[in-house]
Amino acid sequence: MSFDIQIATSYSQVKAQDWDALVTDSPLLCHAFLSALEETKCVGEGTGWQPYPILVYELGKLVGAAPLYLKVHSYGEYVFDWSWAEAYERSGLNYYPKLLVAIPFTPITGARLISNKPDVQAMIIRTMELQMQQYDLSSAHVLFTDESSSEALKVSNWLRRDGVQFRWHNDHFSDFDDFLSHLSHDKRKKIKQERKKVTNAGVICKRIKGADIRPQDWDFFYECYTNTYLEHRSTPYLTRSFFDEIGTSMPKNILLIIAELDGRSIAASLNIYGQQSLYGRYWGALEYVPNLHFELCYYQAQEFCIAENIKYFEGGAQGEHKLARGFLPRPTFSYHKIANPDFDKAINEFAHREASGMVAYYNELEERAPFKIN
């Protein structure tokens, strides 16, 4: 069977229904999300993210794809390779540009070599390797891979890096109190105290699904979102128009939570969800209320998952405090191909040392699990 492998320069060059047929129930990987990033200039010319999606057709049908980008920096990736770039620079070599398969600004595990056919996944990998050779690129990277993509990259002898994120599992809880009943006494008590303090402060939280989000709600959320970046003295990755775009194109996948105090909005969090998983993505506050972050980013979302029968709440990277809120650690993987043999050897040695430390860290987190021991 013959395949036609194409490298597009825009998501407008692939039909949304064809792309989405490959990524069922993956809202952060759907055509609407990826094209919104491009259409609202979060990626593209001048951003350091140039989209080059790989498309594999068989008899005219899209049977494989990968969200490939050409990168000229390492911002917005969440698998950190700055030290590699610095080592290249010290040696008089260019680390950038590099190839990257990822969802921009989104550290979420999922399909990256998007196909259920191993031979098609192998073609995508080989296409990236050929692009590295043809354009004399330093490296290629595939971030936050699911099991299928990980296996294909392992078979192709790509270097693996390990990480840890936190996930909450909705174990058929009937309500939030049912969830709390499964926690150890001290964790249950702490959560109740935190929620009570927020309530006693007079805060009211409103959960708004995508179709009901008004322009003024988006305006307020974006003010909160940008304020978070300003507090960390950095620049927001996403434009205001991006949120308008996803609000219009994928409203069934969006949950906005706004906190109000004395009739005024003071904080907001944005979640994106599918049938099986909810992803906590962005948060910001214009006024400080103790424990409001936990209420808005964790407890409200957990209640929503229980009410909507959503199985997983992906809490993302960092934040060991998530353990005390019912989250458990889960491993993450990324895969890397380094063209220079000397750097390939050195980075392999680095990754093996890093992996040993990550195993110890993961085991430590598991020992601190918040649930009752039967």
What is the meaning of each model-derived region?
Residues M1-N374:
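N-acyltransferase acceptor-side catalytic subdomain
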